[in-house]
Amino acid sequence: MTYLMNNYARLPVKFVRGKGVYLYDEEGKEYLDFVSGIGVNSLGHAYPKLTEALKEQVEKLLHVSNLYENPWQEELAHKLVKHFWTEGKVFFANSGTESVEAAIKLARKYWRDKGKNKWKFISFENSFHGRTYGSLSATGQPKFHKGFEPLVPGFSYAKLNDIDSVYKLLDEETAGIIIEVIQGEGGVNEASEDFLSKLQEICKEKDVLLIIDEVQTGIGRTGEFYAYQHFNLKPDVIALAKGLGGGVPIGAILAREEVAQSFTPGSHGSTFGGNPLACRAGTVVVDEVEKLLPHVREVGNYFKEKLKELGKGKVKGRGLMLGLELERECKDYVLKALEKGLLINCTAGKVLRFLPPLIIQKEHIDRAISVLREIL
């Protein structure tokens, strides 16, 4: 008997605690975590600096709403803007889908403020941007739409790495192009440097906002603080969440100064967004991730080479956001790995996705590879 709605196809295990890169079930069995709560636990589990900061904040102040000044928001926003390509402003939300919704609203508001009727968006096939109506409409996967139609009007889907398909969808009412530079849920599909360069040119040429969904790729996951930095892009807006709080729910959008000005009092908001606890968590995560970036690149390259050596499929991704595309469905392998104490994820049917904590070491990767070699 359960009192929970049947939303999730849960695996047959109950975790009761975590430490570092490991989770432990009710029986005390140890599991090597290469999922990180779907890219959330950037610093692993029970990371001492994060744990201590949260304990201190809980005893001080949890929530005040956005009716008042919030120094914790200011501190975290400054740290996020510091890594942006230009001066910008931050709006805080609670999740990835809320961040994408905020980006959509901001883009429409920006063009309305400029007196232009630009309200449409182009996103990409196999993309995933969230499950609330705006972000769901931006998601280029019909399986997520089924049963929830009609969707929000104005969204169309181009093919990743096919610039002609983007041109075909563009018109004078296009407000923004929304893209993940590496699609996560869609199968760890990377946009090419040439394609992204041309996409940037289109946005500039056609007066369209470039919105990058960094919910999964951001905050050090790919070896750069923001994944767009691999490609020398200059986005107008980026959406953040997942790894930013290290396990505490938080989302954010970061927009360049001119675009950000379109959010004015009453235009958009959030009761919980940017509460002191979440922002305190985010501040610790950002400080630690800044120091971890060279490590993420090093162990990410090591992991990628080890996956290639398996010779079992196409290896995709960057840093510690990697995928192994198999020739058959991968759901069974997730269960086999679970039995052997390794947590991995199957996405897009045939892609094993790996999102370990950013603190992972080479010996952990060796252990994971050993399990993969055995089960594959």
From Swiss-Prot:
Pathway: Amino-acid biosynthesis; L-arginine biosynthesis; N(2)-acetyl-L-ornithine from L-glutamate: step 4/4. The keyword Amino-acid biosynthesis applies. It is found in: Cytoplasm. Disulfide bonds: none annotated. Its main location: cytoplasm. InterPro entries: AcOrn/SuccOrn_fam, Aminotrans_3, Aminotrans_3_PPA_site, Class-III_PLP-dep_AT, PyrdxlP-dep_Trfase, PyrdxlP-dep_Trfase_major, PyrdxlP-dep_Trfase_small. It is an enzyme of class 2 (transferase). One of its GO terms (cellular component) is cytoplasm. The keyword tRNA processing does not apply. GO terms for biological process: L-arginine biosynthetic process. Keywords: Amino-acid biosynthesis, Aminotransferase, Arginine biosynthesis, Cytoplasm, Pyridoxal phosphate, Transferase. Its cofactor is pyridoxal 5'-phosphate. Pyridoxal 5'-phosphate binds at residues 96-97, 128, 213-216, 271. The modification N6-(pyridoxal phosphate)lysine is found at residue 242. Binds 1 pyridoxal phosphate per subunit. One of its GO terms (molecular function) is identical protein binding. Its EC number is 2.6.1.11. May also have succinyldiaminopimelate aminotransferase activity, thus carrying out the corresponding step in lysine biosynthesis. HAMAP family: ArgD_aminotrans_3 (MF_01107). Belongs to the class-III pyridoxal-phosphate-dependent aminotransferase family. ArgD subfamily. Homodimer. This is Acetylornithine aminotransferase. The gene is argD.
